[in-house]
């Protein structure tokens, strides 16, 4: 795997979200897809449905879903008969999500956006599937750019840790 600067990757993810118009999941995946030989169009397509907490349903934060997608490349479990690989993959996903939860209090989009109290697991009706317009007001009231940066840093640190242990 080629070397990379984690700060550049974090800033790239934030920029892709804020200036590029990509959703939170896409921004995290597109910050690292090249390390795994995946082209941008494929990466953006794979991650496209996870924005807004999965299709704007405000469930698992899209940036956490982005880390989960990348976990499949970091610790692949492509053969369902190899239980050890699945266990390692799930452990990595739990580690990444746990670190995000520790830093932010939740991995649930509606809680992170302040739509429901943290830890309440209250149901909120699904919003329109139409994405919000990316205006200055949109960015002012949403923590998403910051959360994208946090996820990009968490997964980047894990990639560097694994590369350094080779």
What does each model-identified segment do?
Residues 2-4, 31-49, 122-128:
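Acidic-glycine-rich active-site phosphate/pyrophosphate-binding loop
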Residues 14, 20, 39-43:
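Contiguous domain-boundary segments centered on the initiation and propagation of an alpha-helix
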Residues 90-166:
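C-terminal binding/interaction regions
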Residues 22, 50-69:
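Glycine/serine-rich anion-binding loops at beta->alpha junctions
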Residues 1-19:
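Polybasic, low-complexity association/targeting segments
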Residues 35-45, 73-92, 163:
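Phosphate-handling active-site elements
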Residues 17, 21, 32, 36, ...:
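Structural signal for hydrophobic packing residues in well-ordered secondary-structure cores
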């Amino acid at each position: 795997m080629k070397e990379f600067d984690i700060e550049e990757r974090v800033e790239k993810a934030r920029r892709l979200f804020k200036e590029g118009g990509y959703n939170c999941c896409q921004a995290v995946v597109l910050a690292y897809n090249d390390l795994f030989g995946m082209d941008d169009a494929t990466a953006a397509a794979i991650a496209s449905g996870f924005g807004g907490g999965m299709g704007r349903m405000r469930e698992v934060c899209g940036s956490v879903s982005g880390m989960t997608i990348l976990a499949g490349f970091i610790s692949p479990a492509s053969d369902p008969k190899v239980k050890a690989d699945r266990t390692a993959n799930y452990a990595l996903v739990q580690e990444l999500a746990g670190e995000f939860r520790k830093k932010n209090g939740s991995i649930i989009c509606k809680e992170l956006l302040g739509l429901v109290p943290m830890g309440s697991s209250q149901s909120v009706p699904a919003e329109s599937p139409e994405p919000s317009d990316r205006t200055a007001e949109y960015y002012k009231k949403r923590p998403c750019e910051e959360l994208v940066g946090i996820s990009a840093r968490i997964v980047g640190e894990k990639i560097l840790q694994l590369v350094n242990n080779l």
